[in-house]
Amino acid sequence: MSQSLANIVVHLVFSTKGRRPLLRDEERGQLHAYIAGILKNHDSPLIEINSVRDHIHILFAQSKNHAPAKVVEQVKTWSSVWLKQQHAWYADFAWQGGYGEFSVSPRQVEAVRRYIRRQQEHHAQKNFQTEFRHYCEKNAKPLDERYAWD
């Protein structure tokens, strides 16, 4: 086959360093738009994004031309730099060192979109750690708690 095809949808989740509740409503929409631009520049279009005070969920179509870890690195690095430029509130802002990256089957994309859109509702009832543990279990991905929470 002379053509290269890829249909890889990724659900990316990561928190603020130490799960500090730093993401303010005032910057959230602009942050989401900025991250969408980073993904677009890496040929990985955004499908859905939402965040709460201490973490973010990003659903996107992973490019076949860019390594997944590199795309995540760019999103985390440049969004952190951008936040620090927005307000003194973010002077010592950092994302956690790690992240969760889960593949999403085409049949599940809409369900994951709905899940991401409803983050504020979810987190009225459970915290990020509980949510992330559940998501790892659901995706058959063992979680080593010694290294999961920085």
PLM feature spans:
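Basic nucleic-acid-binding interfaces
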Residues: 1-150
